Structure formats: C-alpha cells, structure tokens
A protein has these predicted regions:
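Acidic, low-complexity intrinsically disordered segments
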Residues: 2-245
Length: 245
C-alpha cells in the first residue's frame, strides 16, 4: 500500500437510482452532481485534510468496484453523503447507502458515517436500525466533520466529545449536543465552493451527469454535461406548498 495515497475522508455517493426509478434509471432519470459532497470536500481540504469522492451513481459502480477503490485509497473515514435536490430525496436515497454500508462492514475495517437529511431528522432511529453505521452527523456537518477528522482514532471516548454527531458504543446509542451551523459571515471561508476536480468524467468534465428532461426541453442531446448549483443554504420564504412548511 502506498502511504502517500492514504486520505482522511472518502465521500461516497451511493447508487440508489435503479431501486428508485427501475428501468427508467438507465436513460431517463437525472444524474445530479453531489452538491453537498462537493461542498464538504472543498471545506475539509481547505483546512488541510486529504479527501476524495466516489460517485457510484454517476459511474454506475458496483459495491465490488467501490471496495477496490477504497482499499487503494485507504481512507481513515468513509462518509456516505445522502442528499437530493428535493428535501425528501434523502430518505429515498438511503436504501443505496445502507446497502453499501452493510457490504463494507463485512469486508473492511474502516469507520463508516452518514451525513444527510434523513439522518439529521432521525439520527437515533437510523443507528438503532442500521448496525453497519458507526456514527451520523446531526446537522449540516461542516464543523463536526472537521473535528471528527482531527481525532487520532474513532473510539467511543473520542466521539463522545464531538458536537453534532450521534454514535454507537456497543449496544448503546448516544447523541451529542448540536454543533453550530455556518454563519453568513463565514460562508465564503468555511464553505469555499465546490470540489469540481474530484468528480469523475469520461471525455470532459461533468459529462457523466445529466439534467432532468424538462430542464433540457426534452432533448436528450442537451442533457449533458450538466451541473447544479446552490447559491445559498436554507430558504427565507414560507411557501405553503413546500413540504418543509
């Protein structure tokens, strides 16, 4: 193993589209760039940590394909990022993440964490149900992840001191006090953009991603390359048709 390859955190985006969209996943469903994985990767490496991203959805990777890459990269921590462009997509995409975490737990000895909207809403329930997950992040995870990566090992004693996570200690589940979210005045420094260079591509950047059909005027040729951007965190409005409200 090449020690120079060892990285602090490997962000993995699971392949959930086939279970969600079945045969439509092959050509019709959109493939979104993993916005939050990109933001977290850029945030953590901006303070000196070595990170990488595996987007199994974009590359259509099997669990065995991913395992080979994990063994090559030898990360200290695996972070499954489970989000979607819609708020409820985090729950829909959990199936792919759990499938991978169970497979990884049987084949490698690397701590596994999850960050995403589903575990933010149900951290204790997720840990009780999913034995393959070692800990989850209970909010956006920017500062909690940095603090997790600072510790020498992921023992229960060390994890108990980290704000913004829930973790297991044998058969017991614990939730720590919340970590602060990124304030507006630190948005540009603590979330300094997207780690676009870590995304996979075939011939040119972003060519593995494709827009929803209605974004491309129902023209297949216009669907790729595709990028999606978030210009803010949260929303100041209170639309009565929004599921959040």
């Amino acid at each position: 193993m090449n020690k120079e390859k060892i990285i602090d955190c490997l962000f993995i985006v699971a392949k959930s589209s086939v279970k969600t969209y079945q045969s439509l996943a092959t050509t019709y469903s959109a493939i979104e760039p993993p916005t939050w994985a990109l933001l977290l990767a850029q945030s953590t490496r901006s303070v000196g940590f070595k990170v990488n991203i595996i987007d199994a959805n974009a590359e259509n990777l099997t669990e065995k394909d991913i395992l080979v890459r994990i063994k090559d990269l030898s990360p200290k921590l695996i972070c499954l990022v489970v989000y979607g462009q819609n708020v409820n997509a985090g729950t829909t995409n959990m199936s792919g993440a759990i499938y991978l975490s169970e497979y990884f737990k049987k084949n490698i000895n690397i701590p596994i964490s999850i960050i995403g909207s589903h575990v933010q809403a149900l951290p204790l329930e997720t840990l009780k149900k999913e034995k393959s997950i070692d800990f989850v992040f209970t909010n956006e995870g920017v500062y909690a992840l940095r603090n997790v990566l600072k510790i020498k090992n992921f023992s229960s004693d060390n994890l108990s001191k980290i704000k913004g996570i829930a973790y297991r200690n044998k058969d017991n589940i614990f939730i720590n006090e919340p970590e602060s979210i990124v304030p507006n005045e630190k948005m540009d420094t603590d979330l300094p953009g997207y780690a676009w260079d870590l995304l996979p591509y075939k011939n040119k950047p972003l060519d593995l991603y494709r827009a929803p059909m209605w974004h491309a005027e129902y023209d297949f040729k216009k669907r790729t390359p595709y990028a999606s951007l978030q210009t803010s965190l949260g929303c100041q409005f209170g639309c009565n048709f929004c599921m959040i409200n």
